Amino acid sequence: MSLPYDSSRRKFMKQCVIGGVTIYSAPMLMNSVHAAENNPIEKIRANWSTDNKPNFRFDAIEKVTGQKIYGRDYRAVDMPDWPNEQHHALIIRASIANRVYLGFDISFLPADIQPYKVITAEDLAANNIDLIEEFGGNMLLEKGKTPDYLGQEIAVLLFDSFAAFNKAKGRIQFNKDVVQYGEQTAVVADAKDPYAAWRIVREEGPLGLADHYSTLQDGLFFPNYVERRPVWPDAENSMADNGKRGMYYAEQLQNDVANRDDWFVLDRTYQTQSIEPMAFEPESYNGWYDRAAKTLHIVISSQSAQHFYYHAGHVIAKSPLASDIKNVVVHTPYIGGGFGAKDHTQFAYYGILASMFAKAPVRIANDRFEQFQYGLKRHPFKMANQLAFDKKTKKITGLVSDMEVDGGGRINFSGSVTMVGASALQGVYYIPRNDITAVCYPSQTPHAGSMRGYGTLQSMSAMEMMFNEAAAELDIDPIELRKINALKPGERNTQGARPNGDMRYVEMLEMAEKHPTWINRQSAKQAFEAKNPGKLYGVGFGIVSKDYGTGAAAPSSSVELTPEGKIIVKTCSVEMGTGIDTSQGNLVSKYLGSAADEVEMAVTEEFDAMELFDTDSPYIISQDRQDEMSNNPRWTPVVSMATAASMSSFYQTQTTEQAARILFEKTLFPAAVEIWRNRYFNGELATPDFLDISEARWSEQGLTIKGYPPIDLATLASKAHLDGMITGVMTHAFNRWAWASAEFEINGELQRYPLDAIAVKRGIGARNVKTNRFGYQVIERKSVDYPKTQLNNAMVTYYAPCATLAEIAVEKASGKVEILSTHTWLEPGKVLVEQLVEGQIEGGLTMGVGHALYEYLPRNEHGAGNGTWNLNRYQVPLAQHNGVWNMNYTLLPPLSESDPAKGIGEVVMIPVVPALIEAIYQATNTRFYHTPVRAKDIVEAL
């Protein structure tokens, strides 16, 4: 079949030029049914949201009718203007990482299934091809070298038919004789310096005054590396050297932890595991190098489409093989799940490599074995923690932690995952003094990346496990100990920064301690075990507060009105099952009186209408440099952002909502005022009494004010277009733990918005308006106020808290854990769509159950990197493991209607982990200091 496109949607407009290669973006791929006129689906969808609440997900109809097509499903024949011929690629990978690679042999394949091209490291060297710099080198392993990691790519094989590809793959995959290895060597990672090292030191000052020392106040300091281990500065109370002074306070704290008799110190070491994200769809790529048109067409499945979009040209521009490529068209379809597994991966770059050599469109698609071997994993953490309490007051007096993080074989966000994990260790507690060290080391394991939780699952679970044990040692109720130590509004985090807003931790704890399962846990244990002599009963609790955002969020959105009054919303976020299209499409109803008729996700090129550019890393840019660049109204610290870090509900909402607000304030309300003035008021004789925009309200019939007739959106849109008013608003924002704001002059009025870029599109009646090639007019900001670069040292200030109470039974004979019930408390801020929040709670809890009880990958040659792992060996939690019929939750209501929505996609996964570990202790009287706690561990303990 072919894929018809509305021609207006296929006008690929120039985005940017990288090394002479012009990068374009195509709209979201759609099934051919969408091309039918008078599509009944559109009539059904017209009622998808009423009274500002969605009746079903925006993409629900496509889901149930089979029209939601994922990138993995597209073949060349489905793509407009592509040849019908589809080629296929197979990647050969190393399954050993401690022997010299000598070569590979596929001569045993019959001639009719031999690849027509074998791409090796020699081809890369001859054609100057490599990965982008941030992934490191060695795109393909050279002969005579030891693999950098298990699963390293050796060669790419190209086949001209699926039959040949499939037969060849069946004979190559799992065949240990294909790749030859020589002498044994040391693991390559052992000779590399750490990927990153962080040290977070704080010494609180007098109440209400500045800290004696903190990361926010005094800045970060870093070690030297000697024999691949960090060597930190000498300790010295020197005002001239923040590193030495930081070490002075770290040393003081360590001495107190070791020697103070009035402190109780819990000293424990925790180990977490390597985990496979298990996204619904493994990664895939399809690409066609149209040599006649000098254009490379690409279909990717990525959470970070914009990152790939801006970097693909760099790979191509370097290579003489691709010197004829002048254009790259990037298609960004739906992706089947993410969890961080498809954020910032290098998979698509191997697709580009294949496309450069292929004779036709070529597809690379991991099967589940290959995804296990290649895909990003969750970082394993080893944490040696010392948590000190005052024996009398039960208040925390200090925290010392030494974390070692396994960063895998290729660097991928490992530095920031390590930093975020370290900064999250404090959980929901106020800690007056801390020395937290976190070092991320390369290893032979498959590369680890930004999997859901981003380091916080590992560190906060350990903190909660410590609190549960400390409560027992101090002979105090676990929730009471938490209430004593809960961080309160205005208190500082371990970096010395004040978290934004009211944390509401104590409120959540008070709700949990009143739950019947908690109140009756002792009597319930006696009754249950008497009734079930073969089982043990336990209840556990955990509470955490997860940051959301990256400290350099840069969302973009646009909201447009057609002449008929249809609303079109476009965002940079990728829909990967979380319902971003539903929430973003619905939230505009606040200002426009109706939800969106069309929502387009993963938009990239069109946002270049704002003509923005960036220059420096937003994390290390100096204040002087930021001040200098801010004078250019086209400059921003960051142009684009990935769909990650629980970004959509808070960050993406900012630009979507502001675009709708501007459209309402500058177009819809003025248009309505003119109609009311001319038709329903003696405007020539008196001043209207309906000029206060705050009094305007949307009703079912339209926009009304102070008793004047409602005017429907279609009428207002028609007038706006005929009069050449603003009918489309595009916005960009930047957030470094606070929003940038800027002044813009729109329609002659100067106003400050929490944005740093605006562009507008005017209606069909507009005359003599200069627009750029995208049809937009950039509204240059008059001034801008970016958050100070020092806020980078805060590491995080936005938090969303979540608590979970878990009730379990343990079968004595088998060690099997049965979840009887769970209750989750979540403070999500303003809820955009409750059903989507509920889905996150259920899905997050399931993933947490997997981390706590089931999911595990060995970190040596027996693990995922050897290519033999799949769901036949890897246990993910199923419905029977989750207690699905007793999975309950409470959403804390917002403090007011002005509360922002919070990013909760990750936090909902975390507290169930320590809750389950504690429940196992309460059942078995055995504490565990690792995850997962599997049935065999429990049997051994019993």
Model-assigned labels for residue ranges:
Residues 129-133, 168-171, 309-311, 339-345, ...:
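Short acidic, glycine/serine/threonine-rich loops at helix termini
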Residues 336-359, 363-367, 373, 382, ...:
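Thiamine diphosphate
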